[in-house]
Structures are given as C-alpha cells and as structure tokens.
C-alpha cells in the first residue's frame, strides 16, 4: 500500500512537487523507472491540428529541397550505410521517420508565430510566403548541423578494414550536411533582407561556437564542468555576453549556455526574424526571440528527462538531470572523470541510479515548467488568437 501511495503522488510527469528533496531513495531501480516513465501523449494529432492552422504541412519530408536530384543522389549513398551503427544513420532516421521527440517542430512554431500577428501592409500574402521560407531554412540549418555532428573521429593509426564504413559514413555526413546548409543559406539570401540575414547569421555563429564550448572527449562529445558553488543562476540569452568560465560547473547556468549555443538561439532568432519580416516593432521582435529561446529550453529539458528515464540507452552527460545531480552530489563527478577520453566508458546504469537518488529529476521538471510558463507569457504579449492557443498546446503536450 505504501508503494501505491508513493506512485500516485508522482503520477503527473511534469507538475513539479513543492518539496525539492528526493523521496525516491528507498525505492528499487525498477520502481523508480516505472514511476518516472512519461505517459503516452497524442503528439502527432496536435502536430496535424497545428498544420491545419498554418495551412501547410511542415514536416521535413515536405521541404522542397528533398525533391532535388542532388538530395536524391545523396540518399542513394546513404542507403549503403543501412545496418551500420554510424551516427549519421540515427540522425537520418529521426528526420525521415519523424521522431518529433528528438527533432522538435521548430518550423511549425515559427509559422504559428507568424500567423499570430497582423501584418501592417497590404502585401501580407507575399510576407507570409517569406516567413514560410524562413521556417524551412531554419529547419534545414538545424538538421544540417545535427548531421555534421554525426561525424565519427577515426584516428589514422586505428584505421583498418573494420573502420571503412565509418570513414564512408563521415563522407556522406559531410556532403549531406553541407548540401542542407548551402541550400538554406541560398534561401536566406533569396529573402533579400539584410536585417534578417544578420539575425539568422548570429545563430549560425552560435552553432559553430557550441562545438568548442567546454571540455570534449575524443569523439567531441561534451563533458560537464567540475561542480562549483552557485550564488546566482541568472543568465542572458545574448550569447556575446556568455563567458565559459562564468558558467561551467554551475548547473543551470552551464545547461542554459550549452543549450542556447547548441541550437536554441537558432529557434529564437528564427522567431525574431519572422517578426522582422512581418514588419513588427522592435519590442515584438524581442518578445519573439525570448519566446523562441524559452520554448526551445522547455522542450530540451523535457526531452532530456524522457531520455534519462528510458530503460536503456546512453544519455548526454551535460543534460539537465546530470548537471543537477552533480550539484547535489559532487562526488558523482569521479565517475565522469574516469571516462574523460571516451564518454562511452561511463557506467550509465550506475550513474542513472545515483542521479535518481538526488533531487535532479524534481529540479529538471521545475526547469521545464519554468521555461514553459515564460514562453507562454511572452507569446501572450505578442497575440491572442488560434495560433497562440495552438502554440500553447504544443508546449504542454511535449
């Protein structure tokens, strides 16, 4: 009976509890994982509803670039990697089969935001066409970056017949990622708007910097900073003002900085550029940027929590639950230090069990809730209509 009552108290996955300290220490591993497993949500249904609002099917498979001969040729080469464990195949699977939990619908959010405001001009149809193009190129840039991150480091001294598929996969990842980024930049130039070009280019700069932020292992996988005492959790979304020494080792600051650099600023700048194309004032543009960043951070926190509570699989060592656990129990950093050369050497099951014994899960839920509420507050400042209501559904359903 005591077990049942504990389970009922933890039944809601994203409604954080008032008490932060963990009450899970007395449970077994299996009991903890059952309690934390997120419930099924009809995400695909919400996506279809949102696409009806914008009047456009926004999945990546519908992007016009996929109809080109160049992409078709690359897809043929990509098929040769079927059955291999190359990282580029995992990314391709997420894109082609619509794994929305790994690839959130950023383009759809930008289009919904575009529909939420009235364009102060008679040529609203042409503006919305530009905003749709902006949504597409934002998705392409993000996907191209993810594919480039799928490159596997194969030291020259270790190359042999067994590594041939890795080397071939790297060539495909480079070509495919380059194609998407070049096509996206061509579409961006086609908008013929210098201000939009500057805003989106700022996000591309952030994506590049994300690959050099903090320590990395031999495969360029991120390693968290050594835990430090935190006196202030506040951090700006203006990436030019973020200093690595000021955030590394400080759980929320480090997580926010890494996540913003690693793509969230692209979503924020995409939302900002959408308002710029829609002839909105600077205040509305700033609201849109803040909204986009908070949406991206909320979704990332939710995705990381779901990844952690899966029964199997490797999770990111710089995810929010890990960083919060290190804050609560700095001794856990010894487990990570032992795998500094290759993060795969970490005993993830043992690390997961130790994480779940801290208050990291509660804090990650609070992190999601905090950014979701802030995102809704910013979108309320922009508009009140069907598009805004649909954005709120997307935030809450994820």
Residue map of PLM features:
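Conserved N-terminal diphosphate/IPP-binding helix and adjacent helical/loop segment
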Residues: 2-166, 214-249, 372, 392-398
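Acidic, Mg2+-coordinating active-site segments of isoprenoid diphosphate-utilizing enzymes
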Residues: 24-42, 112-121, 146-167, 185, ...
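Hydrophobic packing residues in well-ordered alpha-helices of helical domains and bundles
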Residues: 67, 71, 131-134, 197-200, ...
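Generic structural signal for well-ordered, non-transmembrane alpha-helical segments
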Residues: 72, 142, 178, 182, ...
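A short glycine-threonine-serine/GTX helix/turn-capping micro-motif
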Residues: 171, 250-262
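Post-HExxH zinc-binding segment in Zn-dependent metallohydrolases
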Residues: 173-183, 187
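Transmembrane helix-loop-helix
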Residues: 185-204
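Short, amphipathic C-terminal "tail helix"
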Residues: 377, 384-398
């Amino acid at each position: 009976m005591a077990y049942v009552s504990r389970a009922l108290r933890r039944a809601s996955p994203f409604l954080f509890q008032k008490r932060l300290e963990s009450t899970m220490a007395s449970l077994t591993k299996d009991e903890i994982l059952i309690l934390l497993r997120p419930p099924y949500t009809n995400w695909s249904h919400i996506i279809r509803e949102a696409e009806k609002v914008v009047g456009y099917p926004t999945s990546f498979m519908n992007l016009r670039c996929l109809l080109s001969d160049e992409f078709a040729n690359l897809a043929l080469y990509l098929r040769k990697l079927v059955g291999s464990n190359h990282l580029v195949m995992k990314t391709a699977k997420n894109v082609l089969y619509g794994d929305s939990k790994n690839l959130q619908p950023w383009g759809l959010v930008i289009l919904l935001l575009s529909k939420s405001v009235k364009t102060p001009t008679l040529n609203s149809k042409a503006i919305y066409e530009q905003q749709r193009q902006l949504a597409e190129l934002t998705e392409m840039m993000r996907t191209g970056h993810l594919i480039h991150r799928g490159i596997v480091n194969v030291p020259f001294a270790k190359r042999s017949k067994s590594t041939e598929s890795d080397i071939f996969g790297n060539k495909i990842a480079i070509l495919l990622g380059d194609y998407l980024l070049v096509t996206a930049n061509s579409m961006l130039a086609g908008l013929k708007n210098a201000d939009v070009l500057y805003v989106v280019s700022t996000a591309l700069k952030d994506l590049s910097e994300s690959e050099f932020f903090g320590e990395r292992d031999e495969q360029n996988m991120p390693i968290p900073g050594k835990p430090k005492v935190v006196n202030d959790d506040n951090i700006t979304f203006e990436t030019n003002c973020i200093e690595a020494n000021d955030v590394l080792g400080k759980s929320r600051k480090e997580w926010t900085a890494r996540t913003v650099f690693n793509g969230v600023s692209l979503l924020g700048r995409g939302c900002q550029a959408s308002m710029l194309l829609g002839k909105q004032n600077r205040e509305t543009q700033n609201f849109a940027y803040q909204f986009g960043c908070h949406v991206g951070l909320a979704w990332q926190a939710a995705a990381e929590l779901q990844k952690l509570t899966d029964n199997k699989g490797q999770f990111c060592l710089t995810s929010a639950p890990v960083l919060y656990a290190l804050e609560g129990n700095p001794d856990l950093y010894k487990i990570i230090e032992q795998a500094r050369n290759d993060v795969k050497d970490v005993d993830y099951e043992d690390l997961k069990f130790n994480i779940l014994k801290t208050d990291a899960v509660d804090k990650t839920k609070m992190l999601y809730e905090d950014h979701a509420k802030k995102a809704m507050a910013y979108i309320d400042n922009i508009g009140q209509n069907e598009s805004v209501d649909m954005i709120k559904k997307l935030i809450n359903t994820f």
